[in-house]
């Protein structure tokens, strides 16, 4: 179910404070965050976020196309190494 329009997008307060501080200071340093649930809003355009994926921080540069998505959508948490298959099948192809 989608979020109600009258509520507006969800952004953690501590992330928004860091965004405002970075915009006011014209700071290009990445903003380190564990808040994967925060929605990307227009104030974040041009900033780089280091989003935690459970193991390390993934740099995410925010552009206009990212608005409305969550920060966590750009930092995958699972690695797919392929389905297990026998060596003979791979050699035969």
From Swiss-Prot:
Keywords: Ribonucleoprotein, Ribosomal protein, RNA-binding, rRNA-binding. One of its GO terms (biological process) is translation. GO terms for cellular component: cytoplasm; small ribosomal subunit. One of its GO terms (molecular function) is rRNA binding. Belongs to the universal ribosomal protein uS19 family. Protein S19 forms a complex with S13 that binds strongly to the 16S ribosomal RNA. This is Small ribosomal subunit protein uS19. It comes from Campylobacter concisus (strain 13826). The gene is rpsS.
